[in-house]
Regions:
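Alpha/beta-hydrolase superfamily serine-hydrolase fold, recognizing
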Residues: 9-10, 26-306
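N-terminal export signals
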Residues: 2-3, 8-25
Length: 306
């Protein structure tokens, strides 16, 4: 699948529309009238990726092993603190030129699991081009509220803008993240240092999350649902590619499609990129492979930012 060029960036979503048969087959999810009729078990299932991807943990273990190799090969700028929390740390991988663009990748885990160390392997295509990459950690729920997590990501970007040059990174930032990291990418897109973004399989409407097992740790408030749901906020006028796998849970598919439509209504630029047959985990291979659609998307965004 060819990458959408800059002149076609805003209108590209029409070429990536899901077939009507897929859309009509979706189960009741966020904002559907049927959502309120579901049992708690059905609501939990609507957002439980591990229940439908049987090898999700094995895939994550492979990412971790590959990432450990990269960290061992480039140990000079890892575990750099940007705040007081134990997880408030950066792993920086500077490129050949300090002014090269930098991919900042935010990890997923529904804001309550995983860590930045698992995901260094997704910087490989960028590093192979001589560009920079950086991965921030953040405090997980329930030790932090979602309000605090969103602020920590912004604090991390503040630190990188102020201190990155001391570690060989002073170029423009392209922000990306997967799952919860996709949500955090959307929430930090307006940061002054960010030129553009790639949000992968994100959650952009938090209302239904409050009705699931995920809220046992998040404990979302009415104020947070309103203030931290990207779907409820004005579109940021920076390029944001929004992507999902066509084999993902219908709730996640709907989140991405509705968020893109919401941005398009406000003329915010960026394509919607469905990845055929990809589930919540296998979609990430499109970012790790140099020829993957998501890797090529990131490359184009970085080239355009330089």
């Amino acid at each position: 699948m060819a990458f959408v060029h800059r002149r076609a960036f805003v209108t590209a979503s029409a070429a990536f529309a899901l077939p009507p048969s897929f859309a009509s087959a979706q189960a009741p999810v966020a904002n559907n009238r049927g959502w309120g009729m579901l049992t708690r078990a059905d609501r939990d299932a609507a957002y439980n990726n591990n229940a439908v991807v049987s090898d999700g943990e094995q895939i994550t273990e492979r990412w971790g092993a590959a990432s450990a190799r990269i960290r061992s090969q480039r140990p000079q700028h890892i575990d750099l603190p940007y705040g007081r929390g134990d997880r408030n740390k950066w792993d920086l991988f500077p490129g050949d030129n300090p002014n090269a663009p930098c991919l900042v990748y935010i990890h997923g885990g529904y804001w309550q699991a995983r860590n930045r160390e698992l995901y260094s392997c997704f910087a490989e295509p960028v590093l192979a081009r001589g560009w920079s990459a950086a991965l921030p950690g953040y405090t997980l729920a329930p030790d932090a509220t979602l309000t605090q997590i969103v602020q920590e990501v912004r604090d991390a970007l503040d630190w990188l803008a102020a201190q990155g040059s001391a570690h060989g990174i002073s170029g423009p930032v392209i922000l990306s993240g997967w799952s919860a990291g996709g949500h955090l990418t959307a929430m930090a897109l307006d940061h002054p240092s960010v030129r553009a973004g790639l949000a992968i399989s994100g959650i952009y409407e938090l209302g239904p999350i409050r009705d699931t097992y995920l809220n046992e740790r998040l404990k979302l408030t009415d104020k947070e649902v309103a203030a931290l749901s990207p779907l409820r906020l004005p579109g940021v006028g920076k390029p944001l590619a929004i992507t999902y796998g066509t084999a993902e849970l219908p709730a996640l598919v709907r989140n991405s499609r509705e968020y893109h439509a919401n941005r398009a209504r406000s003329h915010a630029p960026g394509p919607l990129i469905p990845v055929p047959r990809a589930n919540h985990y296998t979609i990430m291979e499109e970012l790790r492979s140099p020829n993957g659609i998501l890797a090529r998307t990131v490359m184009r965004l970085m080239e355009d930012s330089a």
